């Protein structure tokens, strides 16, 4: 790896001011050479490393105090390289200092009991200001150059700082010696602090948030030292002074200026005057608020240093003021030239960074300053020779700055030393963390933190454990206000914080995205920037990989393996998770414990753990856009999320795949296409037809998943909004898919999904769209016929079919259970219809008058012949009507376990329907006969099977025709039946019951089994007539068979025996007809009684209703007449009253007339 090795490279980096803009005069002179080179880990001092580590591990929100928007501060030159030049997963080993040396620095920013409290700090500040006003009343902000008269010249930090300013190009020998001496001095100071605090060093792990008991802070030590030094001579002061004197002598021996220092000084004279003028002008323009920006601790330290300055240091400061001012101006010019080439957008943030770093670096400064001041007070002559050297240069440079800049320079020099021999570049961890923090923080955020945490101390939880997962993948580019000096400069060199964390880049934001505050954007934390811009970023130590989102590639350390689970380390020290696309903010904000199963479940939704970006400068990715369009009007996307899971689980791959690009892009694109086609389908767009042609059944399955997953009201609304042509096409495509045998597995999955739906009720189904209801019923029943229905079947019937309340056979559609049957099959199987469904497989077909179905003689439940043979429900059983030990083929009913003999069943089927069959159907029935009696053990069954085989072979070979074959098989069946004695005593021969869907009523076939008091007399009469007709046909068939036998001329027994057999047959027939006649007579008597009872009941009901109706009419007439009477009476009364009034008036008029006549007569 290539790195800067000499001063030439450094000069090359500092001489990049090609535009020649004037440098910024208000920057500190030491900003351009702030510890630019550093040694390796083994060469660094434990104190410096520990101090840097303390600030990298603990950044308190107290750093945000005293923030002012118009203050200007600058970052170090390590920020002048591009962030993208370094690999994402790299973390330098030089930024991992020893833990042993970091504890004391970490504790320095103590707990509630330290001297950094607000009240004590304000009190000390007021005391310092009062003392300062008494000692130096002439000092003002308008004369910053006069401050050099009161600056202490005996500071070791100032002396070291002047060397870094004056000679940036060290020799190998001088650099090494200086690093050693400075390390010793700092280490001694740290040991003194640790001796007073009496604390025990212990390692702090990254996850630990609670510090150990806090020692006294540096501010408290500074005051204590000041107070103790005022006492008369004591042994402790003598010992301390001797130790400091030895340190000063070592610094004096090693602090030899290089030859290049003179050349730099000559160069600095060129821009010295201009720099001084600019500095003065910028100081005059500072407002009263700028004074408030000075950190309180830094102000206190400045006052303490001013009050303890002796006459010797003042004289030396005046003597070297002019000579070192030009050197300081030259350093400022070089710094401004390099720093201001960066972007102006981050200038304001970097200024904030300067203020906060000065405040945080303060605690190490006061105690060393006061120690040196006391030494100068006691033994100024002895140390005069050591002070006169290079320390005056730094003192004069510090004199030209504001108090905050002065303390910053002293603090930087006390911590950051150049130790290496010009090989590596090292930037303080505190500066780097500060720059990174402030580059991501907004101004309003800083003000909020100032308000919320105004009373907090420096002690707080460590943030080092958050650095791994809090790095943001996207740079913030936020314009801030620029000062009047920098407004005219062009933005040439972009300065930005370097992101070296192990988090995945651009995981949730698209390329070019600007907003990092949106959901799912990780927050950037402070990153360690310790590499130069010449570092080789394409080395073999880093590999190209793909993020889980498949958005873009990134470089990372091979140790960050993709073989780990995604949620393995998500709970370490409550770190911010890497993937934040699934409401991570709420989880991390509430500190709720995260379930890892949720990670896998949500990440598997898009395949291979991919999370789609939400926005790309106003343009939504197709999958996200479709999801937005599919959302409900009330803003809910729950249904879309449920369906997204169902879609994604079938195409998801392992998130640990070594090639995440392929799985993520392919599955994501397929998922996006499915969602887009579904959206187009619902919106009525024509593009869904193109998607159907391209996707085929996949598109139909996608829409079906939406239908099955969404709630019923939502899907009903969407069906109402769909065009009619889309609905028709959808039904047709679903029907084609159901007819495709390759989709049986998928159809079964759809049926299981519907079976698990508990929110579908009969009320919702009746209110749903007709097409939606037909699709649901077709999918659940597995019958595509429901997709071709017209309006002949009502929606209520379809809803009942879906709820298993009605038979799904379109030819049956009886209410379930049939005849309120409570057998073990009807009561256990939902939606089972005993009239048309198989007892074994629960399926139905349109076959009738066939041997492919067998029925029970008692309960009339049916079963497929193939199912009965397969499940051994058709087997050999004991013949109850024959001799003991005889067997026959029987069907043992699954519902009632009653055996029904098969020979009589086959005989009835052939006698009644054989003449109506076609050739193919006749051959099929013969095959079923062969199947039924294939395992028969009785003679009749065997003979019938052999006859069926011979007849089937003859038909297939065209030896005989269909009519002749039918006559032969019928004659053979009749002959077998008549030659068996057991059959002659059969009490009853019945015809083949038809399937229930071909009967007029479910109770029609069971009427003859019921009591004579049945409620269906018409059916009983019809049954009796049908039985008689059947026996007449049977008789004719038997006669024909006998005649055929006689015509064959086969050898027979004597004619007498034949006659006897005919007589026996006639007697049997007579007995049979007599029995049936008796049955018919009994049925007729029963019907007569029923008719009489019905008539009586009807007459009684008629009379009751007529009487009730007559009474009501009479009452109604009476009420009307009464009302008429009352009306007439009221009219009569009114007439009588009117008459009386008229008579009274007439009498009055007559009286008046008489009086008038009398008066006229007089």
UniProtKB/Swiss-Prot annotation:
One of the record's GO cellular component terms: nucleus
Zn-finger segments (PHD-type): 835-899
Coiled coil location: 1065-1161
A GO molecular-function descriptor: zinc ion binding
Major location category of this protein: nucleus
UniProt subcellular location: Nucleus
Entries under InterPro entries matching the protein: OBE1-like_PHD, OBERON, Oberon-like_PHD, Oberon_cc
Record region (Disordered): 1-235, 251-307, 321-346, 441-485
Residue spans of biased composition, Polar residues class: 135-146, 163-182
Bias kind Acidic residues: ranges: 203-213
Effect of gene knockout: No visible phenotype under normal growth conditions, but the double mutants tta1 and tta2 exhibit a rootless phenotype and seedling lethality. No visible phenotype under normal growth conditions, but the double mutants obe3-2 and obe4-2 exhibit broad growth defects and developmental arrest of seedlings.
Keywords: Coiled coil, Metal-binding, Nucleus, Transcription, Transcription regulation, Zinc, Zinc-finger
Basic and acidic residues bias: start-end ranges: 1-19, 61-77, 90-99, 118-134, 148-157, 225-235, 263-300, 336-346, 441-457
Pfam families cross-referenced by the UniProt entry: Oberon_cc (PF16312), PHD_Oberon (PF07227)
Alphabetical list of CDD domains matching this protein: PHD_OBE1_like
Record GO biological process: cell fate specification; embryonic meristem initiation; embryonic pattern specification
Its job: Probable transcription factor that functions redundantly with OBE3 in specification of the hypophysis and establishment of the embryonic root. Involved in the activation of ARF5/MP-dependent gene expression during embryonic root meristem initiation. Involved in shoot meristem homeostasis.
SUBUNIT field: Self-interacts. Interacts with OBE1 and OBE2. Interacts with OBE3.
PANTHER family: PROTEIN OBERON 4, VERNALIZATION-INSENSITIVE PROTEIN 3
Name listed for the protein in its UniProt record: Protein OBERON 4
Gene name of this polypeptide: OBE4
